[in-house]
A protein has these predicted regions:
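Nucleotidyltransferase catalytic core that binds NTPs
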Residues: 246-380
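Substrate-binding pocket helix/loop in short-chain dehydrogenase/reductase
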Residues: 81-82, 89-93
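C-terminal helical subdomain
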Residues: 163, 167-168, 179-219
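Conserved NAD(P)H cofactor-binding loop of Rossmann-fold oxidoreductase domains
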Residues: 73-79
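Active-site helix of classical SDR
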Residues: 105, 141
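N-terminal Rossmann NAD(P)H-binding glycine-rich loop of SDR-like oxidoreductase domains
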Residues: 13, 21
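Residue(s) in the substrate-gating loop at a strand-loop-helix junction
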Residues: 125
Length: 380
């Protein structure tokens, strides 16, 4: 491990990524972990930074160009027939599993091309090497990971770089939340340590339990891909592991968004850091929300919000955010900190928090406000 002093783990707050980050830290490596959700407590040698790959902002990752190693462990999926996946799930899945990996790899490609040591590993999946019914989109995203690793490794070899990308392609893993369970680092510790060892050995593909299980799996797949796929479908149907609901984290916030300004944009940007799918409710004319007249028609206000990249869906909202929960069962409710402690949000906390909703209060910041703009427009 003395070949690595600093490392970056993308998706290192849960699952195998968490175990890899902790194994590196315990070996004395200074680790920067990027994740959408941050842990309540930090381990020694680990710095946590919030990052949602879906925002498209990779600037925090670019600040880590001096790292000795990068591990891309972000990923998500759901066992379900392809037609049961939502459009939002498809977007989130490919942007996280494939596009996010490609962009991070591209950021560090100059380091991989250097003659001095640089190490890179990605957590792929056996589903990316075979046909995988019920995992069609997930398998396709991981197939993109496999193809990119193979091609870029060939480019590195052609340019006489000693560095390589390790594609770790496991099957089902215990001790992760992938199938709805809980994180148990003890169950993934050995796999994490072996991943690090093989990365340092500059291996290019590692399939855990290859001899015991996956050698035969791959042989059956290559012998008759369609027959293998049908058998895989039947096995998953019988396993009882079908995911009935999307596993995306949904965020919701509401506002009038009349006279849109930088404060609104910052609110939307910060909200997206927490969730996979951000729904924004826009109050119609006559709403009791703030009881203020609007200058811009509802349809135009909605169109402005819809055009912002952090927003996934725009709806006409009801007066009360808790009423919207019955229509859109969100996981996060976002609002400014000036609402904390009000009768309205005390009621929301009592009603929504027992349902698993997190109410995130963003610190109020001084700057341009709708009130200022409205006063400027009406001033004579």
């Amino acid at each position: 491990m003395n070949r690595i002093k600093t490392a970056v783990v993308i998706g290192g707050t849960s699952g195998l990524g968490r175990s890899i980050a902790e194994a590196l830290a315990q070996a004395g490596v200074q680790v920067t972990v990027f994740g959408r959700a941050l842990p309540e407590s930090a381990l020694e040698n680990i710095e946590y930074q919030r990052l949602n790959l879906l925002t498209g902002d990779f600037s925090p990752v670019k600040e880590e160009m001096d790292a000795d190693a990068v591990i891309y462990a972000a990923g998500l999926g759901r066992i379900a027939p392809f037609e049961k996946l939502t459009e939002g799930e498809l977007t989130t899945l490919f942007r996280t599993n494939a596009e996010g990996f490609a962009k991070v790899l591209h950021i560090f490609q100059p380091r991989l091309l250097e003659k001095k040591d640089f190490f890179f590993a990605v957590i792929g999946s056996i589903a990316g090497l075979i046909s995988s019914p019920m995992f069609a989109a997930y398998g396709a995203s991981k197939a993109a990971v496999t193809s990119l690793c193979e091609s870029v490794n060939a480019e590195l070899a052609a340019q006489d770089s000693p560095n390589r990308i390790l594609n770790v392609s496991p099957g089902a893993l215990k001790g992760t939340r992938f199938y709805g369970g809980e994180d148990d680092p003890e169950q993934t510790r050995e796999l994490a340590e072996e991943t690090i060892r093989r990365m340092l050995s500059r291996e290019k593909l590692w399939i855990p339990k290859y001899e015991e299980i996956y050698k035969g799996v791959l042989e059956r797949y290559h012998a008759d891909a369609e027959k293998f796929g049908v058998e895989s479908w039947n096995y998953k149907m019988e396993s009882g592991r079908i995911g009935e609901k999307p596993r995306m984290k949904i965020g919701f916030l509401s506002g009038t968004f009349d006279l849109f300004h930088i404060g609104h944009l910052n609110l939307l940007r910060r909200a997206k850091q927490y969730c996979d799918y951000l729904v924004v409710g826009v109050h119609p004319p006559g709403s009791s929300h703030k009881n203020k007249p609007t200058f811009i028609p509802l349809e135009e206000r909605m169109e402005i919000i819809r055009a912002i990249k952090y927003v996934d869906e725009v709806v006409v909202t009801l007066d009360e955010d808790d009423e919207m929960y019955d229509i859109i069962p969100y996981d996060f409710l976002f609002v400014g900190s000036d609402y904390k402690g009000t009768d309205r949000f005390n009621r929301y906390e009592a009603e929504l928090c027992p349902k698993g909703v997190q109410i995130i209060y963003f610190p109020y910041t001084q700057g341009t406000s709708s009130t200022q703009l409205r006063e400027a427009l009406t001033r004579k």
